[in-house]
């Protein structure tokens, strides 16, 4: 079965998307956005949803004057083909209480991976922002990966590594090749995690990787990248099967992130996202799910604050301590996030 890549999906669906703070909301969508932002948060006693601390485990930043992002080209991503900095992010949180963030690598040119890691370590060392850790980029398919990781192996601000697996030049099954598996095992020995960002029809490979690397914590990004509006029944069945297999591995977790990008720009509502999100929450259980913002990529469909509001709307009937696990506590535990 042909598998859909995240960027191929973006190319097909987001040419008319709106970027968060840089572009005004279109007139036809103002009422819906306003209603979403004004939805009364769940309240228990004197505490409501907007009092909950949030750890955003998927904060992208990129400075295009410094880094090259080979994937950031074409009409689909034109509106995010500019620099996005911490100062931009901090202006977009709305009523939401983001107290910690974990940087997520941005698939820079491989020659710049070390520089990217050093850049975000600098941000982690500053007190004027909430970044407490980072998932850095790395080429786990390379025999040089161990050498690359040497400077970061004992740094507790480096929480883990990601290799994007859905790029066109990365074949199905790459994460199960011998060198790749050995490097994922090596991450476990270092106490680092590995993020799985892969095609929805290939999640079973991720489940197998979890079996081969029992000492390494794996986190499936973006609910497994299944488009919320897809009518491809075979793909959905393959995704669900893979997610169930992954959930059977106690070392594998699910990140509730990225899903908003697969919704219809300027024509989505929280109920469009709910089936995929509820499936993930039910399959993995609340103790193995964690929140991610995926900013600025999320802005191809919705501003960051609207994505957070939508997720709060979807889970509003859950107890606030349950929600605190999803939005904050699980992230701190899974990624071993430490205070500044």
What function would you assign to each model-found segment?
Residues 3-57, 67-70, 75-78, 82-100, ...:
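Mid-to-C-terminal alpha-helical segments outside catalytic/metal-binding sites
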Residues 111-127, 216-220, 270-282, 306-314:
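Short, electropositive alpha-helical surface patch
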Residues 63-102, 155-171, 216-217, 224-229, ...:
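Active-site gating loops and adjacent loop-to-helix segments of metal-dependent hydrolytic enzymes
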Residues 38, 111-202, 208-211, 224, ...:
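Active-site gating/metal-coordination segments in enzymes
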Residues 59, 106, 223, 294-295:
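Active-site metal-binding loops of divalent metal-dependent hydrolases
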Residues 58, 101, 134, 187, ...:
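Conserved, mostly hydrophobic/aromatic
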């Amino acid at each position: 079965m042909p598998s859909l890549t995240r960027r191929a999906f973006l190319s097909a669906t987001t040419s008319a998307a709106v970027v968060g703070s840089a572009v005004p909301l279109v007139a036809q969508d103002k009422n819906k956005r306003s209603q979403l932002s004004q939805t009364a948060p769940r309240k228990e006693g004197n505490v409501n949803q907007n009092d909950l601390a949030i750890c955003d485990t998927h904060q992208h930043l990129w400075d295009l004057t410094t880094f090259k992002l080979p994937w950031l080209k074409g009409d689909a991503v034109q509106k995010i083909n500019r620099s996005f900095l911490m100062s931009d992010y901090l202006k977009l949180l709305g009523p939401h209480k983001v107290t910690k963030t974990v940087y997520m690598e941005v698939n820079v040119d491989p020659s710049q991976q070390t520089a990217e890691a050093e850049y975000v370590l600098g941000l982690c060392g500053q007190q004027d922002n909430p970044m407490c850790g980072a998932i850095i980029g790395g080429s786990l398919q390379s025999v040089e990966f161990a050498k690359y990781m040497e400077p970061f192996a004992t740094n507790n601000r480096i929480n883990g590594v990601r290799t994007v697996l859905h790029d066109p030049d990365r074949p199905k099954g790459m994460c199960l090749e011998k060198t790749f598996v050995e490097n994922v095992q090596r991450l476990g020995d270092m106490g680092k995690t590995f993020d799985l960002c892969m095609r929805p029809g290939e999640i079973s490979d991720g489940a197998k990787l979890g079996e081969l690397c029992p000492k390494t914590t794996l986190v499936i990004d973006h609910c497994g990248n299944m488009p919320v509006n897809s009518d491809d029944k075979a793909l959905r069945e393959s995704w669900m099967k893979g997610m169930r297999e992954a959930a059977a591995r106690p070392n594998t977790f699910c990140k509730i992130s990225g899903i908003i990008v697969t919704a219809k720009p300027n024509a989505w509502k929280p109920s469009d996202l709910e089936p995929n999100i509820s499936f993930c929450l039910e399959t993995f259980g609340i103790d193995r799910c964690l929140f991610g913002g995926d900013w600025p990529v999320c802005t191809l469909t919705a501003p960051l604050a609207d994505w957070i509001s939508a997720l709060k709307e979807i889970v509003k009937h859950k107890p606030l301590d349950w929600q605190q696990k999803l939005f904050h506590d699980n992230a701190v535990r899974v990624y071993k996030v430490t205070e500044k």
